[in-house]
């Protein structure tokens, strides 16, 4: 079925999730009657390099638009996507560089903890919240991530961190 992907990061910054909600949600705002999936915006935040700081609670980042500071936590990201009214929302995840195994494991664990918090924060029965599998280029970490997330009981899953600096051979 045709589906549109919208990005929470960009919509959060401009025009703002609450404004979109007041205008009737993404479907009405975009004039799209079919399913809409919103990405958490995690990839965009992590691509900001010098404009972001990650900790176990979330991510502090500066807007690429005006330099203003914002804090993404799992709860903020879920609330934003709920306000947007997407049919499918994604948890906040940490997109780590793929080659550093120790950091890939750390980021994977953080993503799992954020996924648990996202599930607790999620309130819309009419919106599916998906978990995101991570683990860099390491097959065993990817398998561990998939097992951990499926045990949490998400209705769907995405594969995160692909095409984030790995070679074709990886």
Where are these regions (language model features)?
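Glycine-rich phosphate/ribose-binding loops and adjacent secondary-structure elements
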Residues: 109, 121-170
């Amino acid at each position: 079925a045709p589906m549109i992907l919208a990005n929470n990061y960009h919509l959060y910054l401009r025009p703002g999730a609450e404004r979109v909600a007041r205008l009737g949600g993404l479907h009405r705002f975009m004039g799209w009657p079919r399913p809409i999936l919103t990405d958490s915006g995690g990839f965009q935040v992590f691509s900001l390099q010098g404009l972001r700081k990650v900790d176990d609670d979330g991510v502090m980042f500066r807007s690429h638009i005006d330099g203003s500071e914002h804090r993404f936590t799992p709860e903020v990201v879920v609330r934003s996507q709920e306000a947007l009214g997407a049919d499918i929302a994604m948890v906040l995840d940490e997109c780590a560089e793929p080659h550093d195994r120790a950091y890939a494991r750390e980021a994977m664990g953080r993503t799992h903890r954020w996924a648990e918090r996202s599930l607790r924060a999620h309130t819309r029965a009419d919106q599916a919240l998906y978990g995101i599998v991570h683990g860099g280029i390491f097959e065993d970490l990817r398998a561990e991530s998939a097992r951990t997330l499926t045990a949490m009981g998400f209705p769907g899953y995405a594969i995160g961190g692909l095409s984030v600096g790995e070679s074709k051979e990886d």
